Amino acid sequence: LLLFINLLCFVFVSKGQNLVLNPSFEDTIACSVFQNNNYPQMPCTGWYWASGGSCDYFSEQYLCISSPAPYNGWGWQYPKTGVAYCGFALFTNFSPQFNNYREYLGGQLIDTLKQGHTYCVSFYVVNADSGKYYTSNIGMYLSPDSSVDYSTALNLPYTPQIVNTNGIIYDTLNWTQISGNYVAGGGG
């Protein structure tokens, strides 16, 4: 009873520039650093858990993890580009302890967004083979700070500015692009 969506990258485009730090998740930290201090940091530079739920990292080359790509423990999936991707559970309901459990992935930008400027934002998702739920309700929340809450693995109170308009995403083979325009407000 696990919905598992694999996330490829957040792409912020302003005049063709990608403002995401490590958008394909391929720059990694040393195995010893990750294995000794992995909460809430992901093994890929610039990415982190944005809640108490633990996102997953899959790579064809990073051997510090037990679930390399393309077989990832939840099914089988090649990365959209490169050799790595991240995955997270949007909803699980498999026991009373994990009722409404959610995972959120956070990422860093290489520069501050300029107030009043419009940015094209896109990312790609695909369902895990083992997923038993599907969703149309997936999006991205942009914030001038890290917007994390490690005290909970439940639904966070943020309204995403970029939302899926493709309907329910059933595909377990092909990556689906989710995109939209974002006008940066004050503070970033």
Where are the language model's segments positioned?
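Bacterial Sec-dependent N-terminal signal peptides
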Residues: 1-20
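Aromatic (Trp/Tyr/Phe) and Gly/Pro-enriched flexible surface segments
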Residues: 17-118, 122-128, 133-143, 150-188
